[in-house]
Regions:
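A short, surface-exposed loop/turn module that caps and links secondary-structure elements
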Residues: 29-54
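Enriched for short, Lys/Arg-rich terminal
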Residues: 1-25, 56, 64-85
Length: 85
């Protein structure tokens, strides 16, 4: 299986400033691991959308996969209470 390129949407990058550094480091590691494993253990497909969710502590990472061009788009990162709004 080929490695997928990771692209983080600008709106998701803006969320980095509001996340504590100890959590941010783990979130970045989780995002990097998506290039090797698109659907890791605990990954959930969101209903009604072609998006997936993975957990990192109290934070959620929402992403979509473009198989034709081998890209994973990280769409949103946020606290579990706010990320789905």
């Amino acid at each position: 299986m080929e490695k997928y390129k990771i692209e983080i949407k600008e709106s998701a990058v803006k969320e980095f400033n509001s996340i504590p550094k100890k959590d941010l480091k783990k979130i970045v590691q989780k995002i990097r691991s998506l290039s090797d494993n698109l659907r890791p253990n605990g990954c959930v497909k969101l209903s009604g959308q072609e998006r997936y969710r993975i957990r990192q502590g109290d934070y959620r990472i929402l992403y979509s996969i473009e198989n034709e061009i081998l890209v994973v788009y990280v769409i949103k990162i946020g606290h579990r209470k706010e990320v789905y709004r």
